Amino acid sequence: METDTLVDAKTGRKCYLDLPSGLAPGEEVTFVLNLHGGGSVGHWQREYFPAYDYVDKYRLVVATPSAATKEPTRHWAADADDDYLVDLVESVLDRLGRSRVRAFWLAGHSQGGMTSQRLLAGTDYFADRADGWLSLSGGRLGPAERSPDFGPPRTEEERTAFEEATARRDVFQRAPTPTADFSFIFRAGEHEITSLPDTSPWAERYGAGPRIRQADVVDDQPGKIHDARYDANPTLSWGRKPTPGTAQVYVYPNGRDGRVIADVVRLDKGHTEGLEPCVTEELIKLMVSAPGGKVRALSSASAQAG
């Protein structure tokens, strides 16, 4: 694996870029834009969803940036970040060469997942290029209801003040359902949601069959990171210190055009417990099994038009 730091020429903003070692000329890669959640940064997200551990094995290129806005908590905002994210993706595509990008995925934790949905629903650039969306507790197409006590430990006054501040800035507003075509994988911790729906409107859209439970993914090693601010008073929904774990995997088979639609639930886990090695790899396997080609098709069409 090779790790580089991308520096945006306009803003000076930095981004982690993880690439596979020994890329051969013309070798295909899967490109992942990995977005952190509210109150987080790129460094934390890179450890929470450590796709970099698998860039060599699955020939991934993973870009993990940080949002610009810091108040009331660091978060992605359209006016502060969308142009930057487009420029970031363009810089990576220029570096790689568009013809070698087999697939392009958005991955986002929490508000980063909500931002992924907003980009897919409201930004032609991403709708036209993204082949898939991995929502890491960032919302489900066909919602999974949040647990009633979801969130970090706060007094009622603290919770109310935070909700009012975020509402004023539209930080956690859910975007419309995208109309673009893409594969969709939802992953959540058991304690974050009341229950996982047993149907999926996204699967129905692609004519996929009823969900099939796959073999559980069992990890004997913990994740790399968690929200240590609340170690003295953790909640199940927000998450505790990382531990080994088991995840249930559900796949909706035979979606049109090979689209991958899947749900993954980590048992006895909350919102901020970093992903364990095996469940991380399982998510990546699902991603690379999905069809791609949008970036390549746009590049080809542009070349023909030119």
What does each model-identified segment do?
Residues 1-31, 61, 77-80, 100-125, ...:
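A domain-start/cap signature at the N-terminus of enzymes
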Residues 23-74, 142-143, 272-273:
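Short substrate-entry loop that stabilizes the transition state in hydrolases
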Residues 75-97:
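Alpha/beta-hydrolase active-site loop
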Residues 185-188:
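Short beta-strand/loop motif that positions the catalytic acidic residue
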Residues 190-194, 271-273:
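Acidic catalytic loop of the alpha/beta-hydrolase fold
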Residues 264-269:
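Short glycine-rich catalytic loops that host catalytic nucleophiles or stabilize transition states
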Residues 275-281:
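Post-His helix in hydrolase/transferase enzymes
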